[in-house]
Amino acid sequence: MQGGLGLATLGGTPLWRSALAADEGDAIVAAAKGIGKTDLKAIMWSNYFVPMKPPMEEFQKATGIGITSIKDISTPTIPQAAMAEALTRSGDFDLIHLGSEMIPSLVSAGYLEPLDEYMQKANYAMNAVGDYGKLPTYDGKTYGIITDGNIFVQQIRKDLMEDGDNKKKFEDKFGKPLAWPQNWDDEFRLMKFFHNPDKGIFGSGNLRSRGFGYVWFLMYLYSYGGFPFDPDMKPTVNTDAGKQALDIYLRDKEVAFPDSPSWGTSQMIPHIAAGEVAACQYWGGLIKLCENPEKSKTAGKWLYGLVPGGEANGKPLWRAAGMPVVVLVVNRNSPRKAAAAYMACWLGTEKASSQMVTDRVNTFHDAWTRPEMTDPRVAQAYSPGGVKAIKANLEVACPNIYLTGNQEFVDVLDKNLGQGYVGQLKAAEVLKSIDEDFAKVVKRIGTAKLKQDYKTYAAIMPTATKPA
């Protein structure tokens, strides 16, 4: 178990070094300098844009290339805006900041510029933990530069786990020590043990609402060796792995907040930070909030670690939800696409990323690079235990449904899982309905096209079965 140790705030420590290291910054500047002054436009949420400003301004000073205008909309709504731009083949926006799961759809629409040639010329490579750097690739090409390393981390209340009375009661009841959960049944047993609404403690802080809950379901499915489709694009959710995943998904209701079917992150996060939750899997950025004593009542009261595992072929299998991987993509219809590509590379450098990641006010960017895992500033923002947990989970990060039509497939999951969770569909009907609805989407988009997409989807799954 890794402890979430409360640490002092950064105070006056400078987060940005004015000159980037020669091996990653100078080559990008050299590649971009000949382009000249360029004003770029982006579709991006301001919550992400604000902490990006200092490195953006540094690049603009060095090259004359800057992002001078953004269309400010939230990241969950950007896919619709991006597809609208793609359908009109508009060159208005140069960069879009969105979840990498949209890459297959946007490539299929002819909207995205491959970035490998720009990266090679700029001597730039994403130095990601594990296989995380594969998640913005498609058909062997790189289409996105990571800026936000979203990954699920297991959180459990340290004070509850280390309480002597709790330890004795748990061992007396279950005949085993109160310990870090190795699998989903271990975690559910732990959540039920701590669940006590009368005292203001709910066992689970996991989300089950539309737009969020499906992420947990996919993680459970992957952890039992499941996959939404076979290579011929036949839906395969209604399988033993799917049944295991659905059981875990639905039983959470026993230890959840009564309003959880309608809660998103903005509703759940305050309850977690206030100490009203015993355990959950959540995006790593929450650690920065929980460990900030100025914003959290529970700083120093959390343990962070690897999410529980499932089982496939008789062996344990760990899969952590790496969704959405938020990336910068470049509009291939833009006359400024080269300038946009080099700006994206610059913002993906270690020095730019570490500044965004260690921002204690704007906490949307999360650590994802190898050097960040040993950077003292990152440890100060997340706690040493938090960083170790992020690294472990990044090593087994699994993607969203990485196919053309992602939003349609996600809508199918949202609808059926939601109806199952509130009792409008019987559990036995949920998986059958998902497979039937998936088959309709496959037919509408085209089986031949999706069979090609499937190859990339399967290829970007993590190779490790557990963290190193």
Q: Predicted regions span which residues?
A:
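N-terminal export signals
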Residues: 1-20
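Hinge/lid segment of periplasmic solute-binding proteins
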Residues: 22-34, 100-153, 188, 216, ...
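Extracytoplasmic "Venus flytrap"/periplasmic binding protein-like
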Residues: 58-129, 141-144, 164-165, 278-279, ...
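C-terminal capping/gating helix-and-loop segments adjacent to ligand/active sites or protein-protein/ligand interfaces
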Residues: 70, 262, 384-442
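A structural signal for short loop-to-beta-strand junctions that line the ligand-binding cleft
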Residues: 84, 91-94, 122-161, 313-321, ...
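Extracytoplasmic/periplasmic solute-binding protein
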Residues: 139-148, 152, 179-235, 241, ...
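Glycine-centered hinge/linker elements that transmit conformational signals in sensory
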Residues: 186-195, 231-265, 307-310
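C-terminal lobe and pocket-closing loops
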Residues: 285-298, 311-415, 450, 454-468
